[in-house]
Curated annotation (Swiss-Prot):
Protein name listed in UniProt: Virion membrane protein OPG147
Subunit structure: Part of a stable entry-fusion complex (EFC) which is at least composed of proteins OPG143, OPG147, OPG155, OPG086, OPG094, OPG107, OPG104, and OPG099. Formation of the viral membrane is necessary for the assembly of the complex.
GO process annotations (BP): membrane fusion involved in viral entry into host cell; symbiont entry into host cell
Organism: Monkeypox virus
InterPro entries referenced in this protein's UniProt entry, alphabetically: Poxvirus_A21
A cellular component term, taken from the record's GO annotations: virion membrane
Length: 115
């Protein structure tokens, strides 16, 4: 009987640890999606580079605005918004653009971890 009680306590303890973690993850993902929808395909400034996001089947992907494989600086955000510009997705590392991976990580963290 004591064994059954200990097993029951174990499952209650695990349940109380896992469920809040899952709900916190879902809350954070929902907040990121709301931030994504609020951007409405406009660019944001991250590390003096213009980033935007696309919602794909594998989730939200960050992309950087480029002109001839050179990231467009934040000072040109008014010229770039709502226009067709070339973009590079952050799913692959680019050695020809210095600091590309760091800026991509920051773009994701700005979307998911804003407070």
């Amino acid at each position: 009987m004591i064994t059954l009680f200990l097993i029951l306590c174990y499952f209650i303890l695990i349940f109380n640890i896992i469920v809040p973690a899952i709900s916190e993850k879902m809350r954070r993902e929902r907040a990121a999606y709301v931030n994504y929808k609020r951007l409405n395909k406009n660019f944001i400034c991250v590390d003096d580079r213009l980033f935007s996001y696309n919602f794909t089947t594998s989730g939200i992907k960050a992309k950087v605005a480029v002109n001839k494989n050179v990231p467009i600086p934040c000072s040109k955000i008014n010229e770039v918004n709502n226009k067709d510009v070339d973009t590079l997705y952050c799913d692959k590392d680019r050695d020809d653009i210095p600091g590309f991976a760091r800026s991509c990580y920051r773009a994701y963290s700005d979307l998911f971890f804003t407070t």
